[in-house]
Structures are given as C-alpha cells and as structure tokens.
C-alpha cells in the first residue's frame, strides 16, 4: 500500500474483537497489537516510509494503553470496543445476531429505539475528552509538551521478554 502512495496504514492486532467474530478466530488468529505496532513502525522507518501515518487498533481501551501505543510509534489509535462501551454497549454478545438489546448493533426498529443518539454522542464525547486529557498528562509527566512527542524511550518494561520484543528498556 505504501509503495503506491498510501497516506496511512491501519494495523489491527488481535487484542480487540467484534461480537460478530467466531471465538476460534477472535482468540487464535493474529498477533498482539503491541507487537504488530512495533513491527509496522520499524518496517515503515526502515524502508523510507516514515512519512506514512500509522494507525493502530485492536484492544486499546484505556488512556494509558493509547499513550503507550503512541510512544511505540502510532500516529493515531482507533477505538472500537472502548467507543461502543462509552455509548452504552453492555456486552450482551448478540452483535452477530442483530438482536442487541440496547439498540447498538441491530437494524430492528424496536431495539434501535432503545438507543438515544444524542445521549450516546455526549457519552462518547466525554470519554474521548477525558482520555485525551489523561494522555496529555502522561506526555507532560515524561517531559513532553504534546502527545505527538511521546517516544519509545519514555517507556520501560518490568519483564525482559517484553522489553526485548518491543525494543524498550527494562526497569525492575
């Protein structure tokens, strides 16, 4: 994709999931998002494509996870499950049947009427604003003035195997 001029690449690790995915696929196909992110950023940088934006997704739910992803080289973090939870998903795991009782993953008009788009939009807005504020705090704590300045050297691992896998320092 980058060889034909793509502006960005989205890498999706297996840490996320959709309620519509079969369990055997969701749990056993792919590699962890952190590893996929590290490998993708290294490849882009090593092949003169550092200008290509890297978007990562797959299991990122909390601001600390998102900030770490940015420090590992993501230019953006796409959220699915976290956004669904923010708008009211209660994880009934009925997405694949189209019978979501809270009205999110359905085309059934009766079920859809249970979701108030204005309330859901406000909840999502509050979640994203709070997450951004917390990520900005993480950047400041490391001496950075913005999220975009977070870098791999701002991270440390407690486990040597994780440090080696992600090319970060070990602090025990």
Positions of PLM-derived features:
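Glycine-rich phosphate/ribose-binding loops and adjacent secondary-structure elements
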Residues: 1-112
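C-terminal extensions of enzymes
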Residues: 88, 116-172
């Amino acid at each position: 994709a980058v060889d034909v001029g793509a502006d960005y690449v989205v890498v999706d690790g297996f840490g996320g999931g959709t309620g519509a995915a079969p369990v055997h696929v969701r749990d056993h196909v792919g590699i962890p998002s952190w590893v996929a992110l590290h490998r993708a950023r290294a490849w882009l940088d090593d092949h003169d494509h550092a200008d290509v934006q890297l978007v990562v997704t797959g299991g990122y739910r909390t601001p600390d996870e998102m900030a770490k992803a940015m420090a590992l080289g993501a230019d953006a973090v796409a959220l699915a499950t976290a956004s669904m939870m923010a708008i009211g998903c209660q994880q009934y795991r009925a997405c694949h049947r189209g019978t979501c009782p809270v009205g999110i993953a359905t085309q059934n008009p009766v079920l859809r009427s249970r979701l108030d788009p204005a309330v859901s939009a406000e909840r999502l807005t509050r979640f994203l604003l709070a997450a951004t504020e917390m990520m900005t705090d993480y950047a400041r704590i490391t001496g950075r003035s913005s999220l975009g300045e977070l870098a791999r050297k701002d991270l440390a691992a407690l486990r040597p195997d994780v440090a080696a896998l992600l090319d970060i320092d070990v602090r025990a």
